Amino acid sequence: MKIGDGPRKLALVGDTHGGPEANTFELASQLADYFRAHPEEVPLSVRLYIIPTLNPDGLALGTRFNASGVDLNRNMNTDLDACPENDWNNHVQGAYGVESDTGGPYPESEPESGLIRDFLLDAAGVIFYHSDGGDVFPAFCEHAPSIALAQTYATATGYRYDRYWGKYNITGGMQDWAGSLGIAAVIPELINGVDADYDQNLAGVQAVLRQADALLPLPEDRVEQGVPVPALIWRYWKAHGGPEFFGPPLAPATLDGAITRQFFERAVLELRPDQADTPYLVQPAPLGRAALAGRALPIAGEGDREGRTFAETGHTLRGAFADYWDRRDGMLLLGLPLSGELDAPAADGQRRTMQYFERGALALYTEDGGVCPEPLGWAALVRARLQDTTAAQQIR
């Protein structure tokens, strides 16, 4: 549910832990009913989203985990901040001293994790409701906006303010992931596992809304290797692999109509305001398709049954490329395969096994078994500069 159209996006998220914390689903639903009836309480600077459940399968099944048996609040990429204690791990700690391998096979492996990651890309603040502890705590790594939000919320609700969750160590937590991107993020723990604590938490949300301009900081532009990067492009770049996947920024961003575009070593990232509040607000340009323009490539034969074939293009993913594509949210970042595996010159001048996708190309480095994106962003920048009719070109 959405109320308001202001620039400061605040999300209230219930029921990450499914059935055992169903009272957070009830709370978020009641808050949605209240603000639907009282939209005037949402200031003009805010757009408020309320998500009653992030884990509908766990809610239906009565389990803490999603349908794949993964704890969603241990599945986020929390390796982005400066605190190694909260880094993602498959082996996680939980209530009553229970430890289990439920962090997921890799960070953000679950569709629910990817959805909340992409939805919060442009958020100023987020409140994740859990139970039961009767306290409020902010993102783990020192993040002043999260701390201020938690203190304000605790004062208004009467919950205890804790700088950290003290019962066990949380790895892969959603609030820590959000804080690492500059989003003010807190977890209020309801007093028990039954009651919704509606009055207390309504007072907490109202207190935040009254102080929204102070407590919900707008996303900030950053500088990477001396190059300025717009706030939302930076968040996307950081959240999806940063220099490891996209490489560094090559030049400042430019504006093309409503689209903000920036060249990176291995991609061109585009900020498209018409896609606000969707996973495509920032998206890689189709550099793989551009690189193959005019080239005829064979479609994988029917006899090739190993791997995963995409009906849309007729091409197959297998082996190291398939594993890389899966772990890197391939449909979002790379798109569909546009070729099968090819033997072709890679960026280092060596002939390597390569594969092209809508938004990029991958090369296999057999020396270490690693897969690396090709620097198509460099090629696109050179091409753009050569085609720039306003630039002074050298003729020899």
What is each PLM-predicted segment?
Residues 1-7:
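Short beta-strand-to-loop junctions in surface cap/lid or active-site-entrance loops
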Residues 4, 14-16, 52-54, 76, ...:
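A mature extracytoplasmic/lumenal domain signature
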Residues 7-13, 19-159:
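Active-site/substrate-binding loop(s) of hydrolase catalytic cores
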Residues 26-30, 67, 71, 111-118, ...:
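Extracytoplasmic/secreted proteins, especially bacterial periplasmic and envelope-associated proteins
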Residues 83-84, 197-201, 275, 367-368:
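Short conserved micro-motifs at the rims of enzyme active sites and ligand-binding pockets
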Residues 116, 126-128, 134-150, 164-218:
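Active-site-adjacent mobile loop/cap segments within catalytic or ligand-binding domains
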Residues 218-396:
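Extended, compositionally biased repeat/scaffold regions that form elongated interaction surfaces
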